[in-house]
Amino acid sequence: MDFNFTEEQEMVRDGLSRLVREEYGAETRREVIGSEAGWRPEIWSQLAELGILGMPFSEDDGGFGGGAVDAMVVMEEFGKGLVVEPFVPTVVCAGGFLKHAGTTAQKEEHISGIIDGSRVFAFAYAEPGGRYDLADLQTTAKQDGDGYVLNGHKAVVIGAPWASHLIVTARTGGD
């Protein structure tokens, strides 16, 4: 079994390593997290141009058909620079939910926007007193016509101020 990275993974790793090294010095990072935005849309655009945001999506969805090892390469390089752009909530969480559970219409509406960087998601899952237990879910979603009415509270939603879309966990039935 070969545990070496592929040539493409090495290229991604080298490119991201260079980007992180050039754009994420300690002082720059402090300035970015202290800014009103808390991240840099221009870096997000660069990640889209480099194909990083489209890596885990199938070619049918406009992506590059990458897998878990490709995501690991990206996350390792992001971790080295403590990158603050919303890759996890947008590409990993929202993209993963859409890829595995989204309808065809939802995929068509959102995945291309994730890939080109025009859509940014935040994940609203934590509830007051919930201690990050996803089964301890009090927020409800009641069907109303073609949509749902949400009722409940969420605790801190990291990235909500700059997100174009939210994914909200809610109970549609049961206790």
Indicate where each model-derived feature is located.
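Intrinsic disorder at enzyme termini
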Residues: 1-8
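A structural signal for short hydrophobic beta-strand segments in well-ordered beta-sheet cores
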Residues: 139-142
